[in-house]
């Protein structure tokens, strides 16, 4: 270790000198950042868990990764569900042109009775065990994902997807609904959206989320691309 970040090295030696794991991040909620927001905008609850990607390649192999690319070892917990969503599902049209996809969202953990979500500290403590490879089968069964985006794998690797967010979300919603009909457990949920027409409406939802003990909200443009940046 020498105290030099990957970002600094890439600035000196070139953008891709060291590979970095793609991740789209949010900016702080303030009026300056809202200058880029187009109304009606989309508001979602900011989830309080562990950021993750569930990746399925064109051969149907499934992998779960953290926001910095570390493998989250869940012993195939999401495999059947994700394959049913994307890979040659009997409930969907033949996906001959499928080249892989990435679900972007947050991992959360249910309590032992699977009746409520654990707080961030407790839940992420269990999920960190999955990163280390020490999570138990019983704990793994209680892991869920709240998903807010779907990106084609090729675009994810390239760092940009020009398909508008609302279109990406619509395709994800269509495929997920078909999968729910054949799944005993909804291991992956789609994060609900609320349209807003101005800053005041977004701020109201933000304050309501805080009052409920949530971390906050995320405000998005419906036509926004996915990009590997904040």
What is the role of each PLM region?
Residues 36-185:
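Covalent nucleotidyltransferase
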Residues 33, 123-127, 195-198, 229:
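A short linear-motif detector with a strong N-terminal bias
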Residues 4-25, 189-230:
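Amphipathic alpha-helical
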Residues 15-45:
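Charged, flexible boundary elements
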Residues 5, 21-26, 30-33, 75, ...:
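Alpha-helix initiation/capping motif
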């Amino acid at each position: 270790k020498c105290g030099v970040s990957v970002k600094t090295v890439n600035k000196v030696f070139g953008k891709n000198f060291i590979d970095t794991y793609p991740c789209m991040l949010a900016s702080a909620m303030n009026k300056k950042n809202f200058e880029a927001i187009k109304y009606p905008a989309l508001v979602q609850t900011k989830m309080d868990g562990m950021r993750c990607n569930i990746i399925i390649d064109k051969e149907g192999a499934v992998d779960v990764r953290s926001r910095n690319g570390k493998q989250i070892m869940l012993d195939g917990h999401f495999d059947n569900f994700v394959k049913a969503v994307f890979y040659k599902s009997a409930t969907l049209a033949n996906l001959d042109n499928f080249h892989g996809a990435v679900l972007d969202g947050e991992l959360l953990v249910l309590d032992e009775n699977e009746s409520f979500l654990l707080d961030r500290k407790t839940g992420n403590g269990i999920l960190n065990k999955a990163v280390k490879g020490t999570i138990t089968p019983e704990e793994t069964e209680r892991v869920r994902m709240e998903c807010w985006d779907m990106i084609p794998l090729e675009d994810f690797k390239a760092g940009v997807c020009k398909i508008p967010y609302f279109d990406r979300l619509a395709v994800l919603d269509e495929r997920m609904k078909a999968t729910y009909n054949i799944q005993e457990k909804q291991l992956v949920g789609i994060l609900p959206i609320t349209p807003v027409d101005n800053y005041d409406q977004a701020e109201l939802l933000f304050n309501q989320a805080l009052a409920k003990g949530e971390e906050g909200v995320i405000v998005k443009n419906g036509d926004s691309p996915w990009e590997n940046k904040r």
